[in-house]
């Protein structure tokens, strides 16, 4: 893990507090996160899992491997856990309401954060930073950082041992 035990515990509390957790395709393929709540004191939480898949047609093996995940795609597919978002006017809020998702935690990746920050779609943004140097992997793009600076304001900073959590809210 990049983050420490305190950051991981807070992440699982955040996961337990929402109805759904979403990631992008690359995060699924590279990190293969479980997207569950792993905290012995919070056992009844089971957020709905969503992957913004996009246009990549190589989805079949992932659909069967992750039958507990809804895949949002830009194409139709026969699987029950694939939801096509083809219409430009597709209403994500309506979809989330139909899935009983009133609160959604976006955990990554960079493309999703880029879209959501640029369009000021986050109510709150939690940024966990580690002092550990990471030489590979996906970093936030400059666009995400610029959107955070221009469209969000930091409301709290917490030092968590060798990690820092900064929370932002939309301006």
Language-model regions, residue ranges each:
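Enzymes that bind and transform nitrogen-containing heteroaromatic metabolites
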Residues: 1-171
């Amino acid at each position: 893990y990049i983050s420490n035990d305190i950051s991981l515990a807070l992440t699982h509390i955040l996961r337990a507090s929402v109805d759904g957790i979403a990631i992008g395709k690359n995060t699924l393929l590279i990190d293969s996160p479980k997207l569950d709540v792993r905290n012995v004191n919070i056992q009844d939480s089971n957020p709905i899992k969503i992957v913004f898949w996009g246009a990549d047609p190589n989805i079949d093996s992932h659909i069967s491997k992750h039958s507990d995940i809804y895949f949002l795609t830009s194409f139709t597919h026969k699987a029950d856990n694939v939801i096509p978002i083809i219409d430009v006017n597709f209403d994500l809020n309506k979809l989330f309401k139909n899935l009983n998702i009133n609160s959604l935690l976006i955990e990554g990746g960079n493309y999703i954060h880029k879209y959501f920050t640029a369009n000021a779609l986050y109510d709150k943004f939690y940024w966990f930073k580690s002092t550990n140097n990471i030489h590979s992997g996906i970093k936030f793009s400059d666009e995400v950082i610029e959107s955070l600076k221009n469209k969000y304001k930091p409301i709290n900073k917490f030092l968590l041992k060798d990690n820092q959590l900064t929370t932002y809210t939309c301006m």
